[in-house]
Design a protein with these regions (language model features):
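A glycine-rich beta-to-alpha transition motif near the start of alpha/beta enzyme domains, typified by
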Residues: 1-331, 335-339, 343-400
Length: 400
């Protein structure tokens, strides 16, 4: 058995195993096998003698010091598909990004400064910088606070995440086809208008009405074979466009994590997964997220992409979003975005006239506010509020 230091952390509405890169084999080709043994995923010999749980997917983060002046730490994210024994590191997890700053502070990778420490994170998956503002006390990250995140019980210490220049991390373009709206040919249906956007992660959006939905549906959709087949087809076709699968039919096994599917509709009143009423006036876009089943909230990377699309004319999200003149949803907390352009983009004059807007997404778990800063049709940054907490820290014994 191989002893490996490990930390189990909740970030937003997700959880992951965190490893320091120095504690893993130098040969990175050995990492996928180690991760699967650590999690005890299906068809690995570890089985019950591991950290795995009855989930179809698992998450792993590997952290190391950054070697340049533009960031403090490197963050490499891995999605483990236990049903297909597949490890994918082509995209990021926005929720788990919120745990990187607290972890880096507590591991001594970043000097703790009270009351707030700024951690600059280089996400190796998307090759983009994420800045994390973490509350600190007595040299460690705080876990207790009054921040509320939909989909997470109770309150916690706020972690503000800003995804810097999030467009084109996978494909090199915000809109990889060059179009704000494309049309997918779906057998037995009229061509489906979709928006393909690569922003924090690749996402495909379509309007609920175009699929015969109201947009307020919840878990009942999981048992509708016609709808699941439609989502699978749309995901597969989008995966092919994004370069994640050679054929759309391969996406179900070869790109189980990306792209996210977002279904958008105008603001409307509904009850969330916990039975709480969400008012139409509290949101700018009503949305639902799917991969193979309904997401209980809305993925953070997909939130950045959806909110950005809602600001850009010609997308399906813009078509259904509340316009400013129609009245804005209520403020959901002060986001630390002052509209100034900082960092490596500060010297670009075309970005100095950027505009920031609060976009509130109403989803299955409640509402999420995203501060989106754009310059024309370029996304400068997207900022969200999350919470994070360490669940366990210790030694994980992994079969050799």
């Amino acid at each position: 058995m191989r002893p490996v230091p490990c930390t189990y952390i909740r970030g937003g509405t997700s959880r992951a195993l965190f490893f320091m890169e120095k504690d893993l084999p130098q040969d990175k080709s050995l990492w996928p096998g180690l991760f699967m043994k650590a999690l005890g995923v299906r068809r690995t010999p570890a089985g019950l003698s591991a950290m795995g749980m009855d989930f179809p997917t698992h998450k792993v983060a590997v952290i190391s010091p950054h070697k340049g002046p533009d960031a403090d730490v490197d963050y490499n994210f891995f999605q483990i598909d236990s049903e297909n024994d597949y490890v994918d590191n082509r995209g990021n997890c926005g929720n788990m990004s919120s745990a990187v700053g607290p972890f880096a502070i507590d591991e001594g990778l970043v000097e703790a400064r009270e009351p707030e420490t700024l951690v600059r994170i280089y996400n190796t998956n998307t090759r983009r910088i994420i800045t994390s503002r973490v509350q600190v006390k007595d040299g460690r990250s705080c876990t207790q606070g009054d921040a509320v995140v939909c989909g997470v019980p109770g309150t916690g210490s706020p972690v503000w995440l800003s995804f810097e220049n999030p467009g084109g991390g996978l494909t090199g373009k915000l809109f990889p086809t060059g179009n704000k709206t494309d049309y997918f040919a779906i057998p037995g249906r009229e061509d489906l208008p979709v928006t393909l956007i690569d922003c924090a992660n690749p996402v495909v959006l379509f309007r609920a009405a175009d699929a015969g939905l109201t947009g307020t549906e919840l878990t009942s959709l999981n048992s509708r074979k016609d709808f699941i087949d439609l989502v699978g087809r749309v995901r597969g076709m989008a995966a092919q466009v994004f370069g994640l699968a050679d054929r759309w039919e391969d996406a179900a096994a070869k790109s189980t994590y990306m792209p996210f599917v977002g279904i958008v509709s105008p603001p409307q009143t509904y009850k969330d997964m916990d039975g709480n009423q969400v008012e139409a006036g509290s949101m700018d876009v009503c949305c639902r997220s799917f991969i193979t089943r309904l997401h209980r909230a809305y993925p953070i990377a997909a939130s950045i992409a959806t909110a950005a699309a809602a600001k850009i004319a010609g997308t399906v999200a813009y078509d259904v979003a509340r316009r400013p003149e129609e009245g804005k949803g209520p403020e959901a907390g002060a986001l630390p975005a002052d509209g100034a352009v900082t960092g490596p983009e500060a010297g670009r004059p075309e970005l100095q006239a950027s505009s920031a807007s609060r976009i509130i997404l109403g989803h299955a778990g409640g509402c999420t506010a995203v501060e989106v800063e754009t310059a024309g049709e370029e996304v400068v940054r997207g900022t969200v509020l999350r919470t994070a907490c360490i669940i366990m820290k210790g030694i994980l014994w992994v079969e050799e």
